[in-house]
Amino acid sequence: MEVTSSTLAGQRFLHGLRTDQLDALAATASEVMFPAGHRIFAEGASVGSFWLIESGYVALDVQVPGERPVIIGTVGIGGLLGWSWLLLPYQYAFGAVCVTEVRAIEFRAPAVRDRCAADPDLGHELTSRMFEVLADRLEGTRGRLVARSLA
């Protein structure tokens, strides 16, 4: 299915962007499906894409030397996967593996960065929204650490 500005307007992360901004993002996007168990990306890999999750769940993990990956969180419906597209050195900070079958909108990161450079308002909006996601995840991690220390 083709990704359109109407498709993107319904995404929580992109709600409120102008139609021309949504059109610019739609030109960089496609719909993808991943089966349960599929590793979307590995920690430290070069960033090529980021995703908005339409259905399913993705586990975020970190590699611990000599151990299995440790799951540090999940991203579900409406969530953003792959915030590292915005920050140098453009490497994924965590790994991501599908817990269930996942349907998502995939954005080509270099093309989105080009559009942000051409439209600073779009760049500001996406950066602000990205930092909201990061702040929410940091708060969630903090809560889990506090709960563990009290257990």
Locate the predicted segments by residue.
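Cytosolic regulatory regions built on CNB/CRP/Popeye-like sensor folds
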Residues: M1-A151
